[in-house]
Amino acid sequence: MGKNVVVLGTQWGDEGKGKIVDLLTDKVAAVVRFQGGHNAGHTLVIEGKKTALHLIPSGILRQDVQCLIGNGVVLSPEALLKEVRELEANGVAVRDRLKISLACPIILRTHVRIDQARERARGNDKIGTTGRGIGPAYEDKVSRRGVRLGDLCNPADFEIKLREIMSYHNFVLTEYFKEEAEDIDAALEELRQMGEEILPMAADVTDILHDYRKRGEHILFEGAQGSLLDIDLGTYPYVTSSNTTAGGTATGSGFGPLYLDYVLGITKAYTTRVGSGPFPTELFDDMGKHLAVKGNEVGTTTGRSRRCGWFDAVALRHAIQINSVSGICLTKLDVLDGLETVKVCIGYKTPNGEITRPPIGCDSYSDIEPVYEELPGWSESTVGLTSVDQLPENAKAYIRFLEEQIEAPIDIISTGPDRVETITLRHPFGE
């Protein structure tokens, strides 16, 4: 009987999901993206060779795996075709192994323009978006005026819808932001041409998923960004525009929640965040710089440096609860190698006393101070270890302490970027 596993980030993104998805795909028939867009960034290292993916599921590097993009993903045709061509240039077959939901909203040129204009207008109060049109595309989806991939199947109707929505966007650009209008005719022709390449890959992804389920195949659902960036449950308004938590799996793919068997939460051994927003354990000293340099903390999608801090057990307990996490994969343990001591945030100090759950709303974070537990570090290297018995005793103690604090088992430990640099204590697919 097949198992259906969700892999998602439990911090603010960049937890190392791509490697773990790639690691687990040797067991699956299909890998599915269910939310976000090309604002995601997954770097895979296979036998020393790096591959960066933003939209196509990480399973594409496994030749027998079907890759699916669900209806919850907002689709940039340009980004999709660029990624397809780059993979093909490296000898990876894509077009016969990738299926994209006909219900995917399309990201238009004007979505990108509006996204970037808004960020400029916010000045110092910017959200920190990637500027790729993700948010405006989701807005149009919710407002029921967006165009979807399936609309390209009817060119006449598509033109009517596109002219209507881009006229509205141009009004916003010219009248509110005082910027130049976008050429609708040029956008229409460009989308028609790209549609000719993309439509052969379009399909009813929900139906395909349930066919795999009925055949008893393993399916893996690949989350993007991180749980603390969820539009509803994250540090609003410094969040992304989609549901990055486990609930988004069902709505973004049409695969009912009762069919999901295991939720794997990916978590760094410390904490990072890109862009603006609350970050209670952020370090502004040499230790923060050390983590950033040793962890190579630069965003795959944006190229921006990530903010770094100690492990936040308070935030992680929240993420585990809202996702019904079955087990944790701890990544980048090796970044902590060589430190005399390591710290874990176990609570937040507020003017009204200590709390052990994150507050709701960003304003409540302004008076928060982290409460730390300090543990002894380890001088030995953990890089490339494949057995828990090989770990230094203090590293084992650190892992046990984290499990106690977050109230969840650590089932996988990543000890390096390559798929083979992994310690598996309990396999999500039970194998």
Swiss-Prot record:
<keyword id="KW-0547">Nucleotide-binding</keyword>
<dbReference type="Pfam" id="PF00709">
    <property type="entry name" value="Adenylsucc_synt"/>
</dbReference>
<feature type="active site" description="Proton donor">
    <location>
        <position position="42"/>
    </location>
</feature>
<keyword id="KW-0479">Metal-binding</keyword>
<dbReference type="InterPro" id="IPR018220">
    <property type="entry name" value="Adenylosuccin_syn_GTP-bd"/>
</dbReference>
<feature type="binding site" description="in other chain">
    <location>
        <position position="240"/>
    </location>
    <ligand>
        <name>IMP</name>
    </ligand>
</feature>
<dbReference type="InterPro" id="IPR033128">
    <property type="entry name" value="Adenylosuccin_syn_Lys_AS"/>
</dbReference>
<feature type="binding site">
    <location>
        <position position="144"/>
    </location>
    <ligand>
        <name>IMP</name>
    </ligand>
</feature>
<dbReference type="InterPro" id="IPR042109">
    <property type="entry name" value="Adenylosuccinate_synth_dom1"/>
</dbReference>
<dbReference type="InterPro" id="IPR042110">
    <property type="entry name" value="Adenylosuccinate_synth_dom2"/>
</dbReference>
<dbReference type="InterPro" id="IPR027417">
    <property type="entry name" value="P-loop_NTPase"/>
</dbReference>
<dbReference type="GO" id="GO:0004019">
    <property type="term" value="F:adenylosuccinate synthase activity"/>
</dbReference>
<keyword id="KW-0658">Purine biosynthesis</keyword>
<comment type="similarity">
    <text>Belongs to the adenylosuccinate synthetase family.</text>
</comment>
<feature type="active site" description="Proton acceptor">
    <location>
        <position position="14"/>
    </location>
</feature>
<feature type="binding site">
    <location>
        <begin position="300"/>
        <end position="306"/>
    </location>
    <ligand>
        <name>substrate</name>
    </ligand>
</feature>
<dbReference type="GO" id="GO:0000287">
    <property type="term" value="F:magnesium ion binding"/>
</dbReference>
<keyword id="KW-0963">Cytoplasm</keyword>
<feature type="binding site" description="in other chain">
    <location>
        <position position="225"/>
    </location>
    <ligand>
        <name>IMP</name>
    </ligand>
</feature>
<keyword id="KW-0436">Ligase</keyword>
<comment type="function">
    <text>Plays an important role in the de novo pathway of purine nucleotide biosynthesis. Catalyzes the first committed step in the biosynthesis of AMP from IMP.</text>
</comment>
<dbReference type="InterPro" id="IPR001114">
    <property type="entry name" value="Adenylosuccinate_synthetase"/>
</dbReference>
<feature type="binding site" description="in other chain">
    <location>
        <position position="130"/>
    </location>
    <ligand>
        <name>IMP</name>
    </ligand>
</feature>
<dbReference type="GO" id="GO:0005737">
    <property type="term" value="C:cytoplasm"/>
</dbReference>
<feature type="binding site" description="in other chain">
    <location>
        <position position="304"/>
    </location>
    <ligand>
        <name>IMP</name>
    </ligand>
</feature>
<comment type="subunit">
    <text>Homodimer.</text>
</comment>
<feature type="binding site">
    <location>
        <position position="41"/>
    </location>
    <ligand>
        <name>Mg(2+)</name>
    </ligand>
</feature>
<comment type="pathway">
    <text>Purine metabolism; AMP biosynthesis via de novo pathway; AMP from IMP: step 1/2.</text>
</comment>
<feature type="binding site">
    <location>
        <position position="306"/>
    </location>
    <ligand>
        <name>GTP</name>
    </ligand>
</feature>
<feature type="binding site" description="in other chain">
    <location>
        <begin position="39"/>
        <end position="42"/>
    </location>
    <ligand>
        <name>IMP</name>
    </ligand>
</feature>
<dbReference type="GO" id="GO:0005525">
    <property type="term" value="F:GTP binding"/>
</dbReference>
<keyword id="KW-0342">GTP-binding</keyword>
<dbReference type="GO" id="GO:0046040">
    <property type="term" value="P:IMP metabolic process"/>
</dbReference>
<dbReference type="GO" id="GO:0044208">
    <property type="term" value="P:'de novo' AMP biosynthetic process"/>
</dbReference>
<feature type="binding site" description="in other chain">
    <location>
        <begin position="14"/>
        <end position="17"/>
    </location>
    <ligand>
        <name>IMP</name>
    </ligand>
</feature>
<keyword id="KW-0460">Magnesium</keyword>
<dbReference type="InterPro" id="IPR042111">
    <property type="entry name" value="Adenylosuccinate_synth_dom3"/>
</dbReference>
<feature type="binding site">
    <location>
        <begin position="332"/>
        <end position="334"/>
    </location>
    <ligand>
        <name>GTP</name>
    </ligand>
</feature>
<protein>
    <recommendedName>
        <fullName>Adenylosuccinate synthetase</fullName>
        <ecNumber>6.3.4.4</ecNumber>
    </recommendedName>
</protein>
<feature type="binding site">
    <location>
        <begin position="414"/>
        <end position="416"/>
    </location>
    <ligand>
        <name>GTP</name>
    </ligand>
</feature>
<feature type="binding site">
    <location>
        <begin position="41"/>
        <end position="43"/>
    </location>
    <ligand>
        <name>GTP</name>
    </ligand>
</feature>
<feature type="binding site">
    <location>
        <begin position="13"/>
        <end position="19"/>
    </location>
    <ligand>
        <name>GTP</name>
    </ligand>
</feature>
